[in-house]
A protein has these predicted regions:
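Post-transcriptional modification and biogenesis factors for structured RNAs
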Residues: 1-145
């Protein structure tokens, strides 16, 4: 949701291409979709990525009213390993600098997940790294890998 750094989004796009998952980008984006660094991070896999852009969070939810959403946040208390993922679930990640909006987290507290940090001096992981960790756990659970 509202990604800011093109190379992170490019790396996530490549991850989505490799796993056959859909990349949903919620605007505003911190870059243009034709950004060189975005394309470079996705390498030559962009044609294999199924992706959509949404003008805002409400538009994505309206188009997917039956979907279940998991919100990844450093403020969560439930580990991503405790979730029971399904094949149609959405994994929602926030901006690199601010994460997800506090109001969204409050409204969806039961669906908030975190990646536990073993070193309390480290606040969070890189967005693309966090996405890969949680996505592969979700795919493992639905037996896609």
């Amino acid at each position: 949701m509202e990604p800011e750094i093109p190379p992170n989004t490019g790396a996530i796009a490549r991850l989505c291409a490799a796993t056959g998952t859909v990349l949903n980008l919620v605007e505003p984006l911190g870059f243009k979709l034709d950004d060189r660094s975005l394309k470079r991070a996705g390498l030559d896999y962009w044609h294999q990525v199924t992706w959509r852009t949404w003008p805002n969070w409400a538009a994505l939810q309206t188009a997917n009213p039956e979907a279940r959403y998991y919100f990844l946040t450093t403020k969560g208390t439930k580990s991503y390993t405790q979730a029971k993922f399904g094949p149609e679930d959405f994994l929602v990640f926030g901006r690199e600098t601010k994460g997800l909006p506090t109001t969204l987290l409050r409204e969806n507290e039961r669906q908030c997940l975190t990646i536990p940090m073993l070193n309390p001096g480290v606040r969070s992981l890189n967005l693309a790294t966090a996405t890969a960790i949680v996505l592969f756990e979700a795919l493992r659970q639905v037996k896609a890998v």
